[in-house]
Amino acid sequence: MLFRSEFYFIEINARLQVEHPISEMVSGLDFVKLQIDIANGEPLPFKQKDLKMNGYAIECRINAEDTFLDFAPSTGPVPDVTIPAGPNVRCDTYLYPGCTVSPFYDSLMAKLCTWGPTFEESRTRMLTALNDMYVQGVETSIPLYKTILNSEEYKNGQLSTDFLKRYEMIDKLSEDLKKEKEDKSEAALAA
């Protein structure tokens, strides 16, 4: 704080950026507001023992990456985009129709978060949000997240740092995309 009432931020803790949307969803707290209040000299309005977690939140970091090229960045113009919205859906993003995904920054385009009173409700809400999200012009991590969220391994909580390799998620994604293409072809022929 400078001159009593002017705030200047040089850097905000990156851990807040990564974790705060889902932490806010399960705690009901606004961490950014609390951080600013603390910087303003105000005490926290609660004690640790008062905190209660509620429900389940899932965050998918929507990246401009090509899964089949070892997650290489995908850059360029984004002529059209649809951002999912609705109850218990949050999407923090810079995307808008006509924007450009630059090669000079991190590939993160959006943090898509969902909440539900149960894991299954949060998971199915995330699948709906991923199906509703559309980013034209660049490759994204959206199809991979759909494959992961639909996998029995994910549903059963069999998570690990080698999840993609251990459960052959890239191969499963390839199969899913092939089936999706076949289904679209069959639908077009039937029409």
What are these regions (language model features)?
Residues 6-15:
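A short beta-strand motif that forms the metal-chelation/ATP-contact edge
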Residues 17, 21-191:
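Catalytic cores of soluble metabolic enzymes centered on carboxylation/carboxyl-transfer
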Residues 1-2:
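Short, small-residue-biased leader/transition segments that mark boundaries at the very start
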